[in-house]
Amino acid sequence: MADRALSRRERQRLETRSELVAAAHAIVKDEGYEALTIRKLAERVGMATMSVYSYFADKQAILTAVA
């Protein structure tokens, strides 16, 4: 099967997801697991709280991605 280039939308989605994971990692590292909330994560990256759920189902899914 031939590899295909990612569309601009797919690249943007991957970049946003990576940004969320990096921000979550920073929050956990600096403030601890209990300090990580969906709201705090959204504020850190400058997006609406509900938009985070487009990338992760819940806090556990974020932590799994961070690990």
Outline where the language-model segments fall:
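Basic, helix-initiating cap at the start of DNA-binding domains
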Residues: 1-31, 35-40, 44, 61-64
